[in-house]
Amino acid sequence: MIKNLLNKRKYITVSSVELNDTELNEDEKPNIPSGMWSKCEKCAKILYTEDLRENFNVCPNCGHHFKLGAYERIKYLTDENTFVEFDKKMVGRNPLDFNGYEEKIKGYQKKSHVIEGVVTGEAYIAQRKVVLCVMDSNFMMGSMGTAVGEKITRAIEYATKNRLPLIIFTCSGGARMQEGIYSLMQMAKVSGAIYRHGRENLLYITVLTNPTTGGVTASFAMEGDIILSEPGCLVGFAGRRVIEGTINEKLPDDFQTAEFLLEKGFIDKIVQRKDLKQVITSLLRMHEVDYE
């Protein structure tokens, strides 16, 4: 009996207290500015946004490369205050009268702070003059419409005329469906301009970023003299499920990744974002030619 008494469980009752926001004055509430913290898409770690920016928008915990806007990427890559933009106000039209397309473009312009899906211009990298085209996935997933194709083509023609090396950062979901065949023809137009640039023995470097797919992959993304890529990028033409459904086979887990393409010889080197400027500088130095 005594043993049973000693082993008997005892409970304590705690009265519940209801908490709500009205118990705190507005001045007492924590004030956390919007955008102060960022969550890594890969490891789910919460990161201080300012620290993330100082680390080239790469997660210090798992190495995941966050999405970069065109102007951010240009800032990381080029010598300070040397970038001069081309065709800044060029915007795509609506050749097929696609319902709601103009409103969609205006919405993305406001959200992404870029006018179109690519930013082009000339700049200096380690005191070497280059022509840059940087696609921005924040604007309609970097899709290639008539304005994107025209801006890239004009930039390439400028590089050819002035005998400058060309660097294109690709990031795209492919051709822009709202512009139909006008969008698809940009593949041939840009490729033709690249051919003429190469015919002058001028250097063309492509840097694949996440994601690079569709018509961009099928044209100028894979036409570089040297093809670099950031780690872990999705690079391909058709989607994984489409391919598996067509061939009735299971694809490898790493299919359509930069690492898979490097192993198969489709790209030349995978480069960490923090090392890109150094690697590109070395390539420019190795290919320097005095044309005078």
UniProtKB/Swiss-Prot annotation:
Source species, domain of life: Bacteria
A Pfam family per the record: Carboxyl_trans
Catalytic activity: N(6)-carboxybiotinyl-L-lysyl-[protein] + acetyl-CoA = N(6)-biotinyl-L-lysyl-[protein] + malonyl-CoA
Keywords attached to this entry: ATP-binding, Cytoplasm, Fatty acid biosynthesis, Fatty acid metabolism, Lipid biosynthesis, Lipid metabolism, Metal-binding, Nucleotide-binding, Transferase, Zinc, Zinc-finger
Segments forming domain CoA carboxyltransferase N-terminal: 36-292
Entry's Gene Ontology BP terms: fatty acid biosynthetic process; malonyl-CoA biosynthetic process
Cell compartments where the protein resides: Cytoplasm
Enzyme nomenclature, EC number: 2.1.3.15
Residue numbers binding Zn(2+): C40, C43, C59, C62
Zinc finger (C4-type): 40-62
Task performed by this protein: Component of the acetyl coenzyme A carboxylase (ACC) complex. Biotin carboxylase (BC) catalyzes the carboxylation of biotin on its carrier protein (BCCP) and then the CO(2) group is transferred by the transcarboxylase to acetyl-CoA to form malonyl-CoA.
Protein name as it appears in the record: Acetyl-coenzyme A carboxylase carboxyl transferase subunit beta
Source organism (scientific name): Clostridium perfringens (strain ATCC 13124 / DSM 756 / JCM 1290 / NCIMB 6125 / NCTC 8237 / Type A)
